[in-house]
C-alpha cells in the first residue's frame, strides 16, 4: 500500500513541475519580463 502512495505522489509532483515549466516557457515566449499572475499562483520566487 505504501508503494502505491509513493507512486501517486511522484506522478503528482511530475504533473505540477510540468505545469510550472509550461507556464514559465509561455511567459518567456510572450516576452514579458514582469512576474505573471500564474507565477504568483504557483508560488515561484520572482526576483
UniProtKB/Swiss-Prot annotation:
Extract one GO BP annotation from the record: cytolysis
Localization recorded for this chain is: Cell outer membrane
Pfam families, A to Z: Lysis_col
**Disulfide connectivity?**
none
Main localization is membrane
Its topology with respect to the membrane?
A: Lipid-anchor
Q: Lipid attachment points, N-palmitoyl cysteine kind?
A: 20
Keywords annotated in UniProt: Cell outer membrane, Lipoprotein, Membrane, Palmitate, Plasmid, Signal
**GO CC annotation:** cell outer membrane
Q: Which residues form the signal peptide?
A: 1-19
Q: Which residues bear S-diacylglycerol cysteine-type lipidation?
A: 20
Q: What does this protein do?
A: Lysis proteins are required for both colicin release and partial cell lysis.
Q: What is this protein called?
A: Lysis protein for colicin E9
Organism whose genome encodes this protein: Escherichia coli
What gene name is given for the protein in this entry? lys
